Curated annotation (Swiss-Prot):
Protein family: Belongs to the intercrine beta (chemokine CC) family.
UniProt-listed PROSITE patterns: SMALL_CYTOKINES_CC (PS00472)
Source organism of this protein record: Oryctolagus cuniculus
Name the UniProt record assigns to this protein: C-C motif chemokine 4
Any one Gene Ontology BP term: eosinophil chemotaxis
Signal sequence residues: 1-23
Keyword terms, alphabetized: Chemotaxis, Cytokine, Disulfide bond, Inflammatory response, Secreted, Signal
Main location: secreted
Length: 92
């Protein structure tokens, strides 16, 4: 039972920390990072070192956090913890 819960927890964590998908508009413009889903869990603040917001070319708005390990995680910009992290990163 404990092994199954551990495996499920690890699988959910890996899925939450997957990098966002890339989509490229037609033409010679460089690729644009877009998010098609958001992380379901709040990231530990000490994992996050930077962020950027997706452009208006993307179908849905997102904040993309970069972790210490170089992963990019899509987050919902309307969630309070996301806004708090963005404010904190702007101040530092």
């Amino acid at each position: 039972m404990k092994l199954g819960v551990t495996v499920l927890s690890v699988a959910l964590l890996v899925a939450a920390l997957c990098p966002p998908a890339l989509s490229a508009p037609m033409g010679s413009d460089p690729p644009t990072a877009c998010c098609f889903s958001y992380t379901l869990r709040k990231l530990p603040r000490h994992f996050v070192i930077d962020y950027f917001e997706t452009t208006s070319l993307c179908s849905q708005p997102a904040v993309v956090f970069q972790t210490k390990k170089g992963r990019q995680v899509c987050a919902n910009p309307s969630e309070s913890w996301v806004q708090e992290y963005v404010d904190d990163l702007e101040l530092n």
